[in-house]
A protein has these predicted regions:
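Conserved class I S-adenosyl-L-methionine
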Residues: 132-150, 170
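Short, well-ordered alpha-helices that flank and scaffold nucleotide-derived cofactor binding pockets
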Residues: 121, 125, 153-157, 184
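A short glycine-rich, Lys/Arg-flanked "PGG" loop and its adjoining helix->strand segment in the class I
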Residues: 261-264
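Conserved AdoMet
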Residues: 2-138
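Short, thiol/selenol-centered motifs that function as redox-active sites or metal-ligating centers
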Residues: 32, 142-148, 251, 255
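Extended basic-aromatic, gly/pro-enriched interface segments that bind polyanionic ligands
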Residues: 140, 161-247, 251-259
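Alpha-helical elements of the RecA-like P-loop NTPase motor core of helicases
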Residues: 117, 149, 180
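Conserved SAM-binding loop of SAM-dependent methyltransferases across substrates and taxa
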Residues: 144-162
Length: 264
């Protein structure tokens, strides 16, 4: 494994002085700031295309996320990057990366545990009584997969009789980067703490190397979930066959009332 040693302090100071000397301070772009006009354009674009409302109070959050995109690109500042990505010159990859950078990916295992209790105690018995072959569930804002895998654990535990129906889960998100994490199903051990011990023993496999503080959802459970990109603001989105259970609370909370009604 490569190691990268920090530059000595004096060396860093010399490099910093040289870099500053190349461009007068008055003309150096403010990489980490966004103009009010561009913030308004960004907020409007994100709300129109993803449904997520971005109030003015989020400006520093937006700057922090966009500055990473600027550093990974050829642009000198956030404003220059915004001018490009919100222009006709932007390609599909540009817009995908832009949306990936700005979407919120807050998620946990067993987030809102009362919802999963209700699924287990009320919904599942009702669906089992209907004698259907497959119970279909949808995690509508899957993020890195924790909600979908929680669903899978609850369903696997509640449908463990040979006479019970099978289940299938569709897990979607607009962010393609977090979907890649979700497909791998690998998580830090700390993130798995909310999972009950019995479920961890049954559905989670720790890394062979104890120095790696992570674990992976077992393959039979991963196989029950199909991950895919989906934008809830697309009026023609398709999830295939009708769903029996839909988890969408954790995305609707970021939408305005009118957008919530439109999605539902």
């Amino acid at each position: 494994m490569r190691r990268y040693w920090p530059l000595r302090r004096n060396r860093r100071r010399k490099l910093a002085r040289k870099a500053t000397a190349r461009t007068p301070l008055a003309t150096q772009p403010l990489v980490g700031s966004i103009s009010s006009a561009n913030f308004a354009r960004v907020a409007d674009y994100i709300q129109t295309h993803t449904g997520i409302k971005m109030p003015k109070s989020k400006i520093h959050l937006i700057e922090g996320r966009l500055v990473r995109r600027v550093r990974d690109s050829q642009f000198a500042s956030i404003d220059e990057y915004c001018d490009h990505v919100l222009s006709d010159e932007a390609g599909e990859d540009d817009l995908r990366d832009f949306i990936n950078a700005l979407t919120t990916n807050k998620t946990d295992f067993f987030r809102e545990p009362g919802h999963f209790d209700y699924l287990r105690d009320t919904i599942l018995p009702r669906l089992r009584a209907e004698r259907r072959r497959v119970i279909r569930c949808w995690s509508a804002a899957a993020s890195s997969g924790m909600e979908a895998y929680t669903l899978a654990m609850v369903l696997a535990d509640g449908l463990d009789d040979a006479r019970d129906p099978d289940f299938a889960i569709l897990a979607t998100d607009i962010d393609t980067q977090v979907l890649e994490e979700a497909r791998r199903g690998v998580y830090p051990l700390a993130a798995l703490a909310p999972v009950p011990q019995a479920m961890r023993a049954r559905y989670v496999a720790k890394a062979v190397d104890p120095r790696r503080k992570e674990a992976r959802i077992i393959a039979p459970l991963r196989s029950k979930i199909s991950f895919g990109r989906l934008n809830l603001m697309d009026p023609h989105y398709d999830v295939g066959e009708p769903m029996d259970v839909i988890f969408c609370r954790n995305v609707l909370i970021y939408f305005e009332k009118a957008t919530q009604a439109q999605v539902i």
